[in-house]
Structure formats: C-alpha cells, structure tokens
Amino acid sequence: SELTIAAQGPNTDTIAAILNRPVPEGAVKFDGHLRAVENAFHIDRMNAQLGQSNLSGDLKLIQGKPPKLKGQISSTYLDYALFQDKNKTGQTTGEPTKVKPVEDSAEADKKVTPKEQRRQLLPDTPITLEVFDQIDLDMAIRFDEVVNFMGFDPVHDLKAKIVLKGRALLVSNLEASGIRGGDLKGNFTLARDAELTRIDVDMKGRHLRFGLAAVPGQTLDSYPPVDIEAKLSGAGNTYRTLARALKGRIKAVQGEGRVSNNTMGLLLSDVFYELFQAINPLAKTEPTTRLQCGVYIVNLDRGRAEIQAVVIQTDKLTILSAGTIDLNTERINVGFETRPRKGVGISASMLTNPYTKLGGSL
C-alpha cells in the first residue's frame, strides 16, 4: 500500500502539547510518500519543517527484534534543542571539586589505611552496551548547520556515516566545521567482541579553541587554537582493563592566546593548581598568561602513557616536560623545567625552583 501525505500548520502548539514540553516556535510542515512493503515501512522524498528547522531524505524501517532503520537524511538548519527536554535540567552548585594536596607520594602512603591504598581511580565495573540492542542503524547524515548542540558554536557541514549493529557502533567519514571555531574529522568504533569491548579512535582536529580557562568577556578568536591528532585502540571487559590496554598516540600543537590564571585555580584541584603555579610562578602575580605556542606528544602502550615531549612557550617563560603516567599501577612520574626567556626582564634567580617533579598515585 502507498500513501502521499502533505500537512502543515501555523504554529507548534499542538506538537508542544503532545510532547509535553516547549518546542521552538514557527510553522509546521510535513510531506512525503509512504509505502508499506511486507515487513518494511518506507518514507520517500520526506520533507519536514518545524520552526526554522528542517529535515529531508529517505527512510526505511524494517520490523524485527531489534527493528532496523536505514536511509539518509539532510538538513539546511537544525536546532538541537528540539531533542532536549528542558524540564529535566540538572543543577550544579558551580563550586569546583577540590582534592587535598599530597606533599610526597611516600609520605602519602604512610597516611592512608591499607583499605584506602587498595582504592583505584579507574573503576573495575563491566562495560555494558545493552543500549545498542534497541535498534540497528545504517544512516548517512548531512547537516549544513546545527545550533544549540552540546554547548558548541553553530556546527557547520556535519557529515557522517553511522552504522549500529550487533552491539557495534561505527561512525565513519565524520566531518564537521565550527566545532569550537575549528574543524574535526575522523572515524570512531565502539564494539563488543565476545567478552571484550573494543574501541578504535582516529580523529583529527584543526584550530579548535576550547577556552577552558578563558578571561571573563574573552572572545572565541583570542582562545589558544589547538591542532590535535588522536589515534587510540584497545579492548577490555571493564573500564579499568580497557584503559590499561590502550595503545596509540596523541599529538597536539597549540597556537597563541590568553588564559586566566584565576580561572585555572577553579578548574584544577589544589595539588594541580599548586603545580601550575610552580611551573609558571608568574601566575601568582599576573591575572593572565599569554601562551605563544605549545607542543604536546603522548605515546600509549598497554596503558602506559609516555609523555614524550611537552614544550610550552609563553611571552616570558619556556616550560619543558617529560615523564610517564602508568594506568596499570595508577602512578604518575612527570618532571618540569621552567626557563625564563631572554630579553623580557626575568632572570633565572627570580625562579624559586626551576625544576618541579610530580610523582605518586593518581
């Protein structure tokens, strides 16, 4: 059987009542050609509009356990708020979580009980992907502009192939621009193989501006831009065993921009903020740090992260770092060296301790 549908309305009041939550205002329109063939339901030449948002494409829903949804959809403009329930918003106090500083790893071991010593940061809970059992997907998407998406700026030219089948999620040929002012592309796989959950990440970002320690009123274009490459893989039956099996490489190159020293204090725990002030002593007296460039290279092999090279250059200092973070033992051993740059009015004698080491348990 076949059916052609064309419907429209002046506003979204009826849809808001059905969903029992606010939706963006505007006209409503839908048209498409519906076909029912055996156990499959087709929507061909679909065009839907809700307010300024629109979707078009072809869909095929195949009945079964689980049901299967195939097709391709595109949009010239999509407001992601349509898919968010504003009546279910969580509230936070806005206060940062502070961690009690530890002076020395050996001294810390003396202060904790044997039970506390057995506690580990990475949970040893099984990874379950039952949510993937709800539906099989085989979709190609192309969105020209998406707004209100997870706190990002308007995302442009979002493209991806998404396949979900048998507890395996594959996102391939992902491309997007406007992600924190930059571009993102790559592939991602999360799959269950027998008793193990496998993850494969191959992503590249260009000119991403995260602004995690922004100065109040700071504009996006003055955040330090970051080019990042991440290639990781691993498999495990718990979050802990998966982390300890990770292999790969992360490389980031950072450009010029400003960060707020006071905001860093809110983002970091006490011990890491003290470390930040130790390797950047000017943060104690100056409100901002002007970063000029930075290079960060981390290699992972079976859960052991080797910080191969970290070089950070501000307008007044050069900071070097190297070390290891072992997810098997959950211990960290990282050293830092701070050098004053020539011709900026800072001498080595002005640095209380140019060498800083962070070691101990995570």
Give a label for each model feature.
Residues S1-N54, G64-T92, V131-F152, D157-L362:
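Small-residue helix/turn framework positions
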Residues K86-E130:
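Intrinsically disordered, low-complexity segments enriched in small/polar residues
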